[in-house]
Each structure stands twice: as structure tokens, then as C-alpha cells.
Amino acid sequence: MTKEIIKQKIRKAVEENPYKKDFRKVSLFGSYAHGKPKKNSDIDILIEFQPASKIGFFALARIQRDLEKKVGSKIDLLTPNSLSDFLKQEILQNAEKIYEKR
């Protein structure tokens, strides 16, 4: 799949997700964002939630499963707090926004 097709599928999956009201921003990073995915690459997605959101581990797992089902690929779903300090700044600066709550 091309990067644009992946972004379209993610955008559609986000729009249909029951937790959408809690999403602040959803971005693509990693090999697909750089246009260099390998055959077995997963899709790296950074999700930022509204400040008042109470999304826990199980809800995050449901969001990930829903995205995987609708996109048709393995998803690595991360939040800014789950990023390693070593890579955090680079990922936050270079991630490609797919969805942002208006």
C-alpha cells in the first residue's frame, strides 16, 4: 500500500472510531511516513488524546485492534508518553498529521 492509501484508510477508521471524541491528533511516523516501508513493516501511528480524556490500556488496545481491522495491516499505536526519550523529539517533529480535532 502507498503512504497516501494508508493515510486515507487511517483517516476513515479514525472518523468511524467510537473513541473519536477523545482524539486530539493522529499522526503517521516511521517507515511509512518516510516512504521506506519494507515488506513486513508495521504502520506506526502516534495518537494524542484530549487533556480530559480517560483512555486507559484496554481502550487503547481496542482502538489499535479497530485500526488494524479497518486498515488491514499491523499497527503500532503509541502515545507521546509511551515514546522513548531518545526518539520522542524527532518523532513529534516529523510525524505526519492525519487527523486533528477542530
Feature locations, PLM:
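Catalytic core of pol beta-like nucleotidyltransferases
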Residues: 1-25, 34-39, 50-102
